[in-house]
Amino acid sequence: MINTSIPLVDLHRHLDGNVRVNTIWELGHQHGIALPADSLETLAPFVQIQGKETSLVAFLKKLDWMVAVLADLDAVKRIAYENVADAALSGLDYAELRFSPYYMAMNHKLPIEGVVEAVIDGVKAGLKDYQVNINLIGIMSRSFGQPACTQELEGLLAHKQHLVAMDLAGDELGFPGELFNEHFKRVRDAGLAITAHAGEAAGSQSMWQAIQELGATRIGHGVNAIHDPKLMEYLAKHRIGIESCPTSNLHTSTVSSYAEHPFRTFMDAGVLIGLNTDDPGVSAIDIKHEYRIAKFELGLSDAELAQVQRNGVEMAFLSESERKALYAAKA
């Protein structure tokens, strides 16, 4: 099912959406934070999906617990380290870990730039102990508004040499992408690549805006592109990567069933699309789970799954020499 001669990658993976249940438990007790359960076993349903959640709101409530325990920068460093460990232990050759420093900082009023530094330090420590390739993507969380995103951007750009790209995440209906055109001009001027969550809660126009105005060369989720034939044609022609996260889309009710997921439609249209975990800690999944879903629920053949693996490597924010090195390591 997974082709061992092709690098296995996960490009849409939120660092702040992958905090271990036992880490939430330990940090909560260490810092005197009231948790919603009185044992490790009973905590899991509050922070991980049990079956299918009914809405994005229910999903996000679980996600919020993952940052609620980030009481100091050591906690941030710990979860960054554990993210590297989890990526390696799940069999990934390469992962891009994205994180929103404002979201991670807000509960305990941590310094935004300090959060960025702690993430970088935690990842560096993890890379010393685990055999995996990792790059970082900074997120601007638009749900908190333009001024918050400016703070977030400045904290991230202060360490731009440790980032490969910037992302726009959050409420795309309430905070459309055009509110952040100036933010992304600064991102482009800094020489970073751009991806954006779009076409998930909003329609295809959100994706057009992300590509044409923000400068996105990849789109997170993008499920609503299938309703716009011109956009589908554009995506295929210009090799705009779709970071697809089928299980997450089901858990947030972006799609009502795997049968309704548009992954196959993208494949048949020749769109560059890859499989990703999104918030693996919340969904309680790993990348191999997504490949099983793609085979047994979405109906992809082993040859098509191999193409999806290759797509992921092509979409990755890597230089050609780095891409070749990933393949060489599998030879």
UniProtKB/Swiss-Prot annotation:
Q: Which residues bind Zn(2+)?
A: H12, H14, H197, D278
A single GO CC term for this protein reads: cytosol
UniProt function note: Catalyzes the hydrolytic deamination of adenosine and 2-deoxyadenosine.
Indicate the transmembrane segments per the record. none
Name used for this protein in its record: Adenosine deaminase
From which source organism is this entry?
Shewanella oneidensis (strain ATCC 700550 / JCM 31522 / CIP 106686 / LMG 19005 / NCIMB 14063 / MR-1)
**What are the residue positions of the site described as Important for catalytic activity?**
H221
Please give the biological process terms from Gene Ontology that the record holds.
Answer: adenosine catabolic process; hypoxanthine salvage; inosine biosynthetic process; nucleotide metabolic process; purine ribonucleoside monophosphate biosynthetic process
Which InterPro entries does the record associate with it?
A_deaminase, A_deaminase_dom, Ado/ade_deaminase, Metal_Hydrolase
Can you quote the record's cofactor note? Answer: Binds 1 zinc ion per subunit.
Family per UniProt? Belongs to the metallo-dependent hydrolases superfamily. Adenosine and AMP deaminases family. Adenosine deaminase subfamily.
- Names of the cofactor(s): Zn(2+)
Q: Name one Pfam family in it.
A: A_deaminase
